[in-house]
Amino acid sequence: RGTMGEVDEARSETDQVRSERFPASDVVSRIQRLEQLEITPQRTAFRRVAAEVRSIIEGLTSTSTDAEALDAMADDLAKIAGVLAAHPKGRVYEGFAELANAGRLTADNPEVQALAAEMYATFDHSPFIGLANPLSPPMSLHLHDDEVTGSVTFGSAYECPPGNVHGGYVAAVFDELLGSTQGLSGAQGMTAYLHIDYRSPTPLHTELTMRAWIHDRVDRKIWVRGTIHDDERLTAECEGLFISMQPGKFKQLLNDRADAEQN
C-alpha cells in the first residue's frame, strides 16, 4: 500500500471524490453507539468514580506530599479497595439497562445480535474513550460523513520524555482513533498493523486535535490514516491496516470470554 509520504495527497482528495469511493455506510460506529447509551444511575456513578480516580492518578504523579500524608491516603484507598473486593465480580457493562445476565447469555441476547447500543457499552470502559475507565485521558471523538475528528489532553501520568506524551500512548491513541474510523468503509475489523511517524514532540496538558479517514479498502482489508496536531503543528501521523471480521466472530469472542471466566 501507499507510504506515509502520500498522506498529504490523500488529505487533498475532495469530499466528493471520497464520498464516491466510500459511500455512507450502514455500519454504525462505536462513537454513535456510545452516544446512544442510556445514562442510567449506575453508569453515571461509574463515570463519577472513574473521574475521581483519574484525578487521584494525576495528582499522585505530580505531588510533593510528605510520607505521613501519603500513608494516610494509602490507608483510605485500601478501605475503598476493600469495599470493591466485597462486591460481586463480573462485567457490569453486560448488565446495563437489564440487557443481559452475563457471558454467553449476552452473546445470545437478540439485542446484542441486532447490534443494539448496549452491546457497545464495553467502550464506555475503554482505556482511551471510556468515561467509566480511570485510565482513559479520555479522548473525545466525533463522527462525520467521511472522517472522524477528535481531541485529547494528556496529564502528567502519560509523561516520557519530560513534558511530553510517551510514544506508546500516542500509538494507542491512533489505534483507538483509526479503529473508530474504519466503520466508514462499510465494515469493522481488527488491527493488523500500525505504521507511525513521530514528527515532533506531543506535549502534555495541551488540547491535541486528531483526524482520521479511510484511505483504501480491498476485500476484507481496510487502510485508515490519521494525524495528531498541537494547534497547527503535526506531532504524529499513522497508517493502519484493519482486517474485517467474519460474520459471527464478535459473538464467538463473547462466548470464548464467558467460557474462560467460568473455568
Predicted regions located by residue number:
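Catalytic strand-loop segment that frames the active site of acyl-thioester-processing enzymes
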Residues: 41-59, 128-164
